[in-house]
């Protein structure tokens, strides 16, 4: 529990926001304490091969490992990473020296004098094995008791719940499953031999019955059952790809005291018994049991249980996808396992994503939780485009900047602003010119947009303005819409005058709010663009201007080594206009190279799924949060994302704040709900009654 809290909790920094960090920690700790499990589980797979020489063994092992990594990707997007020596030794040290700092360093080890042995770095200083049912293990900084048990009895029908239950115990428990598969020839030979043995027993029993004057066919039930089961197994091996596997399940329990050890072992036995199995202590074989526990693929124990491959597959512990990424944000608990979800969007192919859900499904609440975790614990910059005034209170509380964008305010954001210091390979003047042409097309182009001649004239005039601006050394005074109007007017031809006249209402008329130099601070770490006052033809244009300003900010942040996060609420509005849709798609595609993560938020799932560009963005995103959906939208999302019926149930008919989360290639059901009350909850909540 302490290790998990250390990954989740925020440190105080001494600024005015520390009371929010403390509230965040209170909510996170309360969430962790309320879920069914607070365990950190490490799952490893050790593969061993036997060949005639070391070179052949290495080649065989490499091929087998590559094949296994590929195959495991198909198990609910299970991501397997091959461990190097340092990581293998760390695993050993966690079992043999729990609580001690792991001190192995590959470079220092290679240059140590003499012949150093890695065993000296992971083995305990002493092991007292005089007690036949437990070991007393001691090292420099740790002393603990250890008992190894094995699952001696398995039921006729196995369940995958056994390993899951054991790893969920709040104790130091190591579960090792040894599987030694036989080839098909060995499997058939073993079945034939067992079948012959049972037949001999049946013949002996019949002779005994005759001597006693009994019916020769009156056989004990166990013999008849064995014969029937062996016949079924023989037929199954002949007709399918089934093979036999020798197996044993070993369970190691560690504790600081005898009392704690006995309690933990009783809990282990209770979990095993609940699955119709039996667990026994390895009396007089504790050292061998400890060896079998370690991730070495070495099993010196003589006991085994022979299973078919189908039965053995049930024991594989990769049944529940978990997301616990280093330096990740806390997103609540895994709805299936109860374990915490820590995800780091920065560590994936791209940081872009979407939050989708019906009205009242908890979209803005969930997004605010992520923003708070990001803003309070990192130096990243957060920008929100807010058409419904959902994020103003959060920005104000965190000392952010709220910029109201509308025609009637004194706030001015210049759509012609350009950043010339772009260290990318592209030409900033060319890129900005394309953006301005798109914005002008959205503003005065109507439904069909600008025709090629009009587009060419606007392109030429904008390019002229920026070329002169760059040749003059840039500076504070940027080109404006007035300058573009004058440049078009100076063209003299009919089309240029038409375009200049079309711009007039946005230069001197009632809708001239975007004409002039930018007069607001755009350097705050948390900026909310309030676009609720935009309507009519200015809505699309205004949102495009904001996106363009965001891109300018992203360029500056990239130069300063700072990551930017853009949240676009009701992002489907961008797809109502061809120019706006193209602009949003462009920034979405370029985001990764500039350290930008774009998050689209909407309840209009059906609308965006009708658009091919939006569908491609959704299907290629590394981050999705699917909150409660109606049946129609849920079906469409399942088809697009190839989701199963089981996954579908996690985002249909669920409570606000619950849903299905995609991070990388993993899909995890999540529960992000927090109890009402506290400073952050009041900032997150958008419920009318709670907001009063």
Regions found by a protein language model. Give the residues of each.
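Hydrophobic anchor at the beta1->P-loop junction of P-loop NTPases
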Residues: 355
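Conserved lysine of the Walker
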Residues: 363
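Extended, folded cores of ATP/NTP-driven motor/assembly subunits in large transport
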Residues: 1-317
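A short helix-turn-beta junction within AAA+ P-loop NTPase domains corresponding to the substrate/partner-engaging
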Residues: 399-403, 613-626
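Post-Walker A helix-loop "phosphate-sensing" segment adjacent to the P-loop in P-loop NTPases
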Residues: 373-383
């Amino acid at each position: 529990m302490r290790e998990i809290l250390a990954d989740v909790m925020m440190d105080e920094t001494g600024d005015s926001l520390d009371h929010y960090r403390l509230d965040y920690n209170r909510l996170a700790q309360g969430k962790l304490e309320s879920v069914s499990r607070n365990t950190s589980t490490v799952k490893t797979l050790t593969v061993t091969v036997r060949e005639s020489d070391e070179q052949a063994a290495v080649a065989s092992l490499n091929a087998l490992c590559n094949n296994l990594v590929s195959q495991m990707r198909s198990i609910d997007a299970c991501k397997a990473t091959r461990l190097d020596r340092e990581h293998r030794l760390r695993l050993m040290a966690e079992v043999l020296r729990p609580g001690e700092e792991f001190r192995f360093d590959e470079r220092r080890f290679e240059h140590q004098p003499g012949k150093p042995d890695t065993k000296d770095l992971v083995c305990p200083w002493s092991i007292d094995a005089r007690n036949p049912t437990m070991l007393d293990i001691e090292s420099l900084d740790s002393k603990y008791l250890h008992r190894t048990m094995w699952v001696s009895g398995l039921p006729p029908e196995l369940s995958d719940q056994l390993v899951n239950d054991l790893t969920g115990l709040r104790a130091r428990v190591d579960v090792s499953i040894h599987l030694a598969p036989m080839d098909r020839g060995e499997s058939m030979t073993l079945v034939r031999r067992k079948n012959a043995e049972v037949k001999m027993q049946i013949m002996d029993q019949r002779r005994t019955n005759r001597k006693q004057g009994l019916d020769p066919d009156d056989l004990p039930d166990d013999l008849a059952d064995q014969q029937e089961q062996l016949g079924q197994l023989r037929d199954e091996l002949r007709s399918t790809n089934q093979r036999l596997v020798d197996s044993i399940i070993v369970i190691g329990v560690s504790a600081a005291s005898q009392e704690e050890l006995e309690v933990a072992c009783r809990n282990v036995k209770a979990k095993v018994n609940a699955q119709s199995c039996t667990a026994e202590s390895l009396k007089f074989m504790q050292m061998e049991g400890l060896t079998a526990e370690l991730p070495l693929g070495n099993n010196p124990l003589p006991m085994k249980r022979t299973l078919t491959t189908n039965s053995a597959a049930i024991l594989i512990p990769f049944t529940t996808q978990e997301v616990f990424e280093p330096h990740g944000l806390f997103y609540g608990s895994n709805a299936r396992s109860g374990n915490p979800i820590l995800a780091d969007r920065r560590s994936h192919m791209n940081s872009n994503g979407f939050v989708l859900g019906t009205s009242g499904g908890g979209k803005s609440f969930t997004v605010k939780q992520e923003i708070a975790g990001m803003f309070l614990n990192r130096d990243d910059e957060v920008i929100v485009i807010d058409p419904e005034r959902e994020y103003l209170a959060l920005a104000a509380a965190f000392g952010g900047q709220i910029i109201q964008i509308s025609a009637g305010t004194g706030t001015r954001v210049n759509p012609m602003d350009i950043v010339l210091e772009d260290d990318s390979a592209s030409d900033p003047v060319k890129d900005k010119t394309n953006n301005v042409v798109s914005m002008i097309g959205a503003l005065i182009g109507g439904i069909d947009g600008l025709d090629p001649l009009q587009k060419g004239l606007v392109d030429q005039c904008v390019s002229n303005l920026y070329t002169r601006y760059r040749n003059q050394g840039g500076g504070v005074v940027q080109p404006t819409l007035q300058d573009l109007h004058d440049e078009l007017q100076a063209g003299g031809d009919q089309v240029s005058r038409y375009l200049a006249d079309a711009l007039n209402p946005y230069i001197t008329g009632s809708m001239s709010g975007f004409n002039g130099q930018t007069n607001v601070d755009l350097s705050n770490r948390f900026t909310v663009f309030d676009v609720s006052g935009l309507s009519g033809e200015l809505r699309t244009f205004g949102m495009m201007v904001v996106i363009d300003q965001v891109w300018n900010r992203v360029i500056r942040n990239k130069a300063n080594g700072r990551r930017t996060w853009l949240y676009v609420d009701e992002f489907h509005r961008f797809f109502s206009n061809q120019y706006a849709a193209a602009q949003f798609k462009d920034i979405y595609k370029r985001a990764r190279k500039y350290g930008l993560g774009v998050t689209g938020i909407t309840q209009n799932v059906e609308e965006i799924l009708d658009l091919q560009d939006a569908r491609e963005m959704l299907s290629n995103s590394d981050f999705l949060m699917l909150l409660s959906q109606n049946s129609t939208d849920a079906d469409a999302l399942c088809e697009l994302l190839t989701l199963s019926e089981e996954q579908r149930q996690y985002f249909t008919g669920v409570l606000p704040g619950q849903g299905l989360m995609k991070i990388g290639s993993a899909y995890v059901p999540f529960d992000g709900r927090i109890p009402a009350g506290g400073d952050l909850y009041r900032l997150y909540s958008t419920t009318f009654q709670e907001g009063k």
